[in-house]
Amino acid sequence: MTDSPTAGTPYGTLPPASPLPQRRPVSLPRLAQMREAGEKITMLTAYDATFAAVADAAGVECILVGDSLGMVCQGLPSTVGVTLEHMAYHTASVARGLHRVQGTAWLIADLPYGSYAESREQALRSACQLMQAGAHMVKLEGGGWTAPTVQFLVERGVPVCAHLGLTPQTVHALGGYRVQGKGDQAAQQLRRQALELQDAGAAMLVLEMVPTPLARDLTQALPRCHTIGIGAGSGTAGQVLVMHDMLGINLGKNPKFVHDFMRDAGSVRGAIEAYVQAVKQGRFPDDALHAWN
């Protein structure tokens, strides 16, 4: 058996890549061009080779190997139990899937709980492990206290995506899965943190469960940092969902900000293509249904 990009295996076949002339590798400059042109950025989580390859073939620009794998794949009650070794394993699996189909997606991997808070040096060691596994960028959660770490990583050639609003690694300190940034004081704090992270060099910023007007204002205030919303309304530069949520195959009730794209699509690839088109065309999220004002 050959190891060509579209070779079959005894256990299934990864989807073929589109013709190469139609596929431009996603990069930070390209994401900046998309934003300048007003084109929304699409992102989904993936934790294995097959789902990553299908997402890439369906046109998703960014794939996130999220520490949400702890809840989705491992059955943990939160993301806190996910280790760096878990993240490296799944990142390598996703990277191999993209390689096999000549994928072009930008690959982001979460730095898990306890892998970057001790020191900037610890963060760099952890980031290097994920980059060596195949990530193009690492994501970390936290406010202004992470800005020195972000700057340290960026100066050493590690692209960084920050994460504000609801930060699942600290959900116990936040008092549960609640909307963040409500009220003037909380909104001002989020804005200050976002600007600090942009100044530190963060190229992307996930905004999770943040009121729509605040997320829109932050997006306008961050020209060098692409905002990716999840439960943050339609005014961000892009959107992200957990793959299993948008396919309707989670074990619980979907969060308010999720739409089940599988319900009408009939196939995994069809559902992902529907998600991409809905985001691109401004039909998802619907601020009246999937967000907080």
From Swiss-Prot:
Note the InterPro entries from the entry.
Pantoate_hydroxy_MeTrfase (IPR003700), Pyrv/PenolPyrv_kinase-like_dom (IPR015813), Pyrv_kinase-like_dom_sf (IPR040442)
Q: Which reaction does it catalyse?
A: 3-methyl-2-oxobutanoate + (6R)-5,10-methylene-5,6,7,8-tetrahydrofolate + H2O = 2-dehydropantoate + (6S)-5,6,7,8-tetrahydrofolate
Active-site positions on this chain: E208
Q: Which family does it belong to?
A: Belongs to the PanB family.
Which gene is transcribed and translated to give this protein? panB
**UniProt cofactor note:** Binds 1 Mg(2+) ion per subunit.
Tell me which Pfam families the record gives: Pantoate_transf
State the pathway, as annotated in the record: Cofactor biosynthesis; (R)-pantothenate biosynthesis; (R)-pantoate from 3-methyl-2-oxobutanoate: step 1/2
Q: How does it assemble?
A: Homodecamer; pentamer of dimers.
Q: What does the UniProt keyword field contain?
A: Cytoplasm, Magnesium, Metal-binding, Pantothenate biosynthesis, Transferase
Naturally occurring in which organism (per UniProt): Acidovorax sp. (strain JS42)
Does the keyword field hold Magnesium? Answer: yes
This chain belongs to the protein called: 3-methyl-2-oxobutanoate hydroxymethyltransferase
Q: Which GO terms describe its cellular component?
A: cytoplasm
Specify where the region named Disordered lies, as residue ranges.
1-25
Q: Which parts form a coiled-coil structure per UniProt?
A: none
